[in-house]
């Protein structure tokens, strides 16, 4: 480059120059790279979606938002940043959600099923999990220990593409089931199988509280109890 620039600088106006040039071929061409991009399913998970219409809609909406996201090698995915704040203005509906140990209606309730399904797909893809938090209770839609709770302004779910090639998140919803796939390029024969083992259980404790709004002798369950494990 310096030689060419020097010749141009010293040339007379209108002078024709003959310059030596060497063509360097890339180690990998665009066509070669395109042929291997997203050719393999690194990991795939399917969970059954149930509940109110609002909850199902929230799961479908959040899944649609993350579908098609591409991460280059070394890039990190944030569920909260990608999905964004869950508001009614953005199409999310009130639905049951776990809040401080209680089940209450919250805008965006149910989106943890999307993050949990994604989390398990990432585990099966052998991706690097950089941030993940479990629910206080074991959700019914996924195996124990395979969930990932999220909350706007609170817990997030993050993972990093630790492969040599770009990866893509692909989601679909059909027949009451949410499917999450991680597409990428396999470079070895590594195979991931997830298992869990129950080490202990913790029985719940029944706590009674006075409530003047109820008729004498009436009982009302405030929070559905679960056995911890």
Regions found by a protein language model. Give the residues of each.
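Well-ordered beta-sheet/strand-loop patches within structured domains
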Residues: 1-229
């Amino acid at each position: 480059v310096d030689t060419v620039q020097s010749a141009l600088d010293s040339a007379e106006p209108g002078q024709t120059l003959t310059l030596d040039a060497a063509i360097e071929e890339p180690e990998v061409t665009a066509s070669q790279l395109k042929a291997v991009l997203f050719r393999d399913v690194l990991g795939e998970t399917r969970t059954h979606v149930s509940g109110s219409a609002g909850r199902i809609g929230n799961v479908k909406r959040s899944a649609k938002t993350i579908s098609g996201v591409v991460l280059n090698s070394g890039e990190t995915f944030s569920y909260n940043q990608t999905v964004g704040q869950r508001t009614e203005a953005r199409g999310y509906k009130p639905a049951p959600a776990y809040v401080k140990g209680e089940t209450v209606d919250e805008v965006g309730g149910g989106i943890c099923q999307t993050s949990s399904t994604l989390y398990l797909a990432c585990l099966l893809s052998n991706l690097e999990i950089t941030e993940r938090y479990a629910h206080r209770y074991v959700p019914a839609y996924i195996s124990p220990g395979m969930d990932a709770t999220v909350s706007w302004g609170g817990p997030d779910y993050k993972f990093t593409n630790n492969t040599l090639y770009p990866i893509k998140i692909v989601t679909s919803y059909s027949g009451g089931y949410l499917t999450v796939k991680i597409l990428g390029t396999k470079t070895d024969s590594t195979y991931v199988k997830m298992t869990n083992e129950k080490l202990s259980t913790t029985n719940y404790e029944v706590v009674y509280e006075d409530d003047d709004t109820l008729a004498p002798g009436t009982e009302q369950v405030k929070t559905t109890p679960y056995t911890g494990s």
